[in-house]
Amino acid sequence: MNILSRCLMALSRKSRMSIKDVTFSSEGALYTIVISSSTIEQMVSECLKAGVNETGGILIGSYSEDSSTAMIVEATTRPADSLAGRTTFQRGVRGLRPLLHARWKTGLYYVGEWHFHPGGSPEPSGDDFRSMTSIAANSDYQCLEPVMIILGGDPAGSYSLSASVSPRGDAPIRLREVLI
């Protein structure tokens, strides 16, 4: 085993030990998002593979009975037909339909999108918000309030997350991390 492999294994063990579930909420708790630690691990792993390029995928999860809380349990890898560069990411669709159909059978659904801003802030860009507004308006997604999670920074070191929800017909709403 070479040194790089040992370092990646050590980083992987460290990440699993230190990553916890993260909760974001809007003022008045109208919208709440809970991201599982395994979902964050999936995103960090994909970001490490992407290096200096943006990457992303879809978010899969379920909703509370009153639909006020999205519980995110999976972040997919980027579809093979995605386009990515240093400052751009356009998610493809290859393989998503059968994946979502399989998850739907287990009570899980498309809840939104995630992507990576390498070395940068997790703040959503105007393009990010326009994309989510378009998804909210598109009935094909069957998601009235899609979530957007952005991981920014260095996934091997210091990174942070942002969360937004885009209610159909309204402006996107930035959520704040709930510190427990």
Swiss-Prot record:
Residues at the active site: 54
Outcome of mutating residue 54 to A: Does not cleave CdnD-GFP fusion protein. Increased conjugation of DncV to cellular proteins
Enzyme class: hydrolase
Superkingdom as given in the UniProt entry: Bacteria
Residues that coordinate or bind Zn(2+): 115, 117, 128
Listed PROSITE patterns: MPN (PS50249)
Assigned EC number: 3.4.-.-
Inactivation phenotype: Essential for CBASS function; when the operon missing this gene is introduced in E.coli it no longer protects against phages T2, T4, T5 or T6.
Up-regulation conditions: Part of a CBASS operon consisting of cap4-cdnD-cap2-cap3.
GO molecular function: metal ion binding; metallopeptidase activity
Keywords in alphabetical order: Antiviral defense, Hydrolase, Metal-binding, Metalloprotease, Protease, Zinc
Domain MPN: 33-165
An annotated GO BP: proteolysis
Protein purpose: Metalloprotease priming reversal component of a CBASS antivirus system. CBASS (cyclic oligonucleotide-based antiphage signaling system) provides immunity against bacteriophages. The CD-NTase protein (CdnD) synthesizes cyclic nucleotides in response to infection; these serve as specific second messenger signals. The signals activate a diverse range of effectors, leading to bacterial cell death and thus abortive phage infection. A type II-C(AAG) CBASS system.
Family, similarity comment: Belongs to the peptidase M67B family. Cap3 isopeptidase subfamily.
Name assigned to this protein: CD-NTase/cGAS isopeptidase
Gene source species: Enterobacter hormaechei subsp. hoffmannii (strain UCI 50)
Gene: cap3
